[in-house]
Amino acid sequence: MVKNMKIKHFFILTFLLLLSSFFASAQTPLVKNGKAKGRIICSPQNTVNDEAASLLRQFVERISGASLPIVHQANPRKGDIVIGESTTRAGEDGFALESDGGVLRIKSGGDRGSIYGVVELLERYLGVTYYAKDVYTLTPSADITLPHIDMADTPAFRFRQTFSYGNDDPVYRRWMRLESHDELFAADMWVHTFNQLLPAEVYGKAHPEYYSMINGRRQPGNHSQWCLTNPEVFELACQKIDSIFRAHPDKHMISVSQNDGNGTYCQCPACKKVEEEEGAVSGNYIRFLNRLAQRFPDKEFSTLAYLFTMDPPHLTKPLPNVNIMLCDIDCKREVPLTDNESGRHFVKALEGWSRISDNIFIWDYVINFDGVVTPFPNFHCLQPNISLFKRNHATMLFEQNMPTRGTDFLEMKAWMLAKLMWNPQQDADSLMLQFMRGYYREAAPYLYQYQKLLQGALLASGTPLWIYDSPITHKQGMLNATLCKTYNQLFDRAEEAVRADTAVLNRVRLSRLPLQYSELEIARTNPNRDAEGTRQQLDLFDERTRQFGVRTLNERDNRPEDYCRLYRQRFLPVSERNLALGRPITFISEPSGRYADFGANALTDGLYGGTTYVESWVGWEGRDADFTIDLGSTESFSEVTADFLLQSGAWILWPQSVTYSVSDDAREWCPFGTYTFTEDRSLTVKFLDATVTVPQPVSARYVRVSVKGIGQCPSWHYGVGYPAWFFLDEVKVR
């Protein structure tokens, strides 16, 4: 018995020694006591492998102080890392990490696989984590020995893009394994390209038949579409495309896609017939793209499934080299796309496209574009949505964030999106915690609690989350006064926790700006607000946005400094006499739609509208406005003004003119004056006081406001051929 035990122990000890010897021989000793023991071998040598080698050497040196030599086409020895050999274990951008006799081989499945293999090695085995531009963590060590490694990985999507100011940092962009459309599409033509290919300024006057027929007439314009059944359009497009590919021989993909705008597709008899045959507007577009794909079989053509082309055709299937860029712009974001009505409409379209194509590019929207510096708690939707895209044959994915500082928790959202685009099976909540602990350090528990409270309050409120939202939409829900007080307490504690670390403190303060902006927006709708307290909040917001270089508050480049200046002018109380304040209004021509319900109060309530039309503003669509104000008694005044909004992206343009008239009895009217507008094609949101002043005061009880609109959107506009809006709010009589 004792003898058997000794034999058993002998064999166990022998096995352990052999196992230890195996693992020791399989290990890759890179650095010992701060001295390089291994080399980096590029095999073969090319720009991608050179970049991968440089990245590895850079971070090994930051960890250990040792600089690994980079050599080419050398025979590997123990301790070396070989970068760039090909592998069949991974697909495009994928990689394999394989230990072999003390040598680690980082193999590529194609494209940037070797770079991403280096990133995986640094993250998983050397403990380096990159969070945002110039922000990473590592643990210094004079010794680096790699264990035996055998793994392979391929991304879920062959193309992965999101926006962040971090993309300006070349290490960040590679670390997040991100790509850019300009690397793929010829001449950077990747979306809304009709007018780039056949400009209306060049062809529109002589050949209006090339462009959409809308409401019975041809409408050439920057945002009009092509008449896709016109054979001359096809031949001209082919000539232009051929010249572009000849000028960019390194590219094989181009977008041939509708101009931005809704409903501007051609409705001529020939195009209408195709639409009826296909059961969808997209049928005409896919037929056209298939003809291009047949003319250029070695090229790939991307086209939009966006707004009026979102639903797939019933008959025609896209050819394999036709890429469908499907956009979910109209969906609400408070829950995953499968869980609300607007999302389910998109999901139905996605499933329809996935039945007829394996070449789908998803364009997803993950921020509030009307107020990027506004809370947008959709983190719980990211993983299920990206998994949905993957299940339905999407091979390319663009998660549209905003790349500017101050965008709501941009750093965390961009980081999480990058991780999930590579592998959508990861747990989003775990990713959030990992990011917060590394980026916000000791402030992480408070900001995590803030995000969870915000998310819970959004869901409990039942209010949808829209990508063109206003904080005012949520002032009774997730941004009510009680919750905002709690949010501020959490931020106060977060700031206190990192007060000794200026860099981390500034990250917390930058992330607080959306809450501060929301409170300012909500405060301006409260006639009983604390004016001095609001002024102090505005001053702090002004100071912090300047400090952190916040460039814009929305996608239309409205700058924070302009917002603060206008806020002081429009929303902070000043002592001025307004005879129209609170006075009743009678409409001769009522506002459009829902605006008729509250317009009579909103025009004289003393509360100015903000940079989005969804609150305080009163609108008329495609027709003129006419209303009277009863001042209550005969008054003396010399100035009348009305406040107008320009928001071109929402089809809200300046009207032609506004005319003011006065009367004692509301029957006989005398002209007071007319203000004539100048056309403005800017995408920036603007306000304009249409003021008329007379040299001598007049006496009257009634003031009439008559606004002449422009009728239809002009040829340069997104809504060419469709009714234009104009919006106004406060009318003042002084």
Label the predicted regions.
Residues 302, 306-330, 373-380, 406-414:
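Substrate-binding cleft/loops of secretory-pathway carbohydrate-active enzymes
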Residues 608-673, 686-734:
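Aromatic, loop-rich ligand-recognition surfaces of beta-strand-rich domains
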